[in-house]
């Protein structure tokens, strides 16, 4: 059985593809060590209403503008939490309307992967991982089997296509990330977003 990719001397392997790209949100870039690495999967977890969706929508809009300037693929924002109209309204409020920011409302994994195939994004945002379900797996969205399957499929897409993926994740009442604990070990980075939903400041 021949390997899919031949082994090469390490000095001949370009490290450029593994360099972090700034998100345009300074504090998030600081936490991530300079930005998002192509092919990396980042989980942003926090309580409902803390501002996870707004933060990632801002990141998506800034990334879309940067991708357009670099003649790269668009940014695909998939919402399973809200309607496309609700997300568009929030984008207007934060000045996040950009022609390279594509929006899709999907809750089925196959349809989500079809959107990725059709659009060829340079960044994928999924809000949230607990709202997506695979028709091939028993159980409802957010269950252990579903979250594991959905996360696994999205991680595979990130690695195969070399695109960063940002996932929104909810936390339980005791502060733990909802879904199987394995989710935290599957992704490359886990960011905890905290704060009072009525306050102006948030902690990442």
Positions of predicted regions on the chain:
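Short flexible coil/turn linkers enriched for glycine and charged/polar residues
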Residues: 38, 81, 196-200
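Detector for small/aliphatic-rich hydrophobic stretches
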Residues: 1-42, 54, 61-64, 70, ...
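Short gly/ser/thr-rich secondary-structure transition/capping motifs
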Residues: 22-28, 103-107, 173
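Conserved P-loop NTPase
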Residues: 1-10, 117-121, 130, 189, ...
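Residue-level signature of catalytic and energy-coupling elements of molecular machines
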Residues: 31, 44, 87, 127, ...
């Amino acid at each position: 059985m021949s390997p899919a990719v031949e082994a090469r001397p390490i000095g001949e392997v370009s490290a450029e593809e593994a360099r972090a790209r700034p998100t345009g949100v300074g504090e998030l870039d600081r936490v991530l060590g300079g930005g998002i690495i192509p092919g990396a999967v980042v989980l942003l977890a926090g309580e409902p209403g803390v501002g996870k969706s707004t933060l990632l929508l801002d990141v998506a809009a800034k990334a879309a503008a940067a991708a357009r300037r670099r003649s790269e693929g668009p940014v695909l924002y998939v919402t399973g939490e809200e309607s496309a109209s609700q997300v568009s309204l929030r984008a207007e409020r934060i000045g996040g309307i950009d022609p390279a920011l594509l929006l899709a409302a999907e809750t089925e994994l196959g349809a989500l992967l079809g959107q990725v195939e059709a659009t060829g994004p340079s960044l994928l945002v999924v809000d949230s991982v607990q709202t997506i379900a695979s028709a091939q797996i028993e159980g409802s969205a957010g269950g252990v089997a579903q979250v594991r399957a959905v996360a696994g499929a999205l991680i595979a897409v990130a690695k195969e296509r070399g695109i960063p993926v940002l996932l929104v994740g909810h936390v339980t009442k005791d502060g733990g990330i909802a879904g199987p604990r394995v989710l935290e070990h599957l992704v490359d980075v886990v960011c905890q977003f905290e704060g009072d939903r009525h306050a102006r400041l948030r902690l990442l």
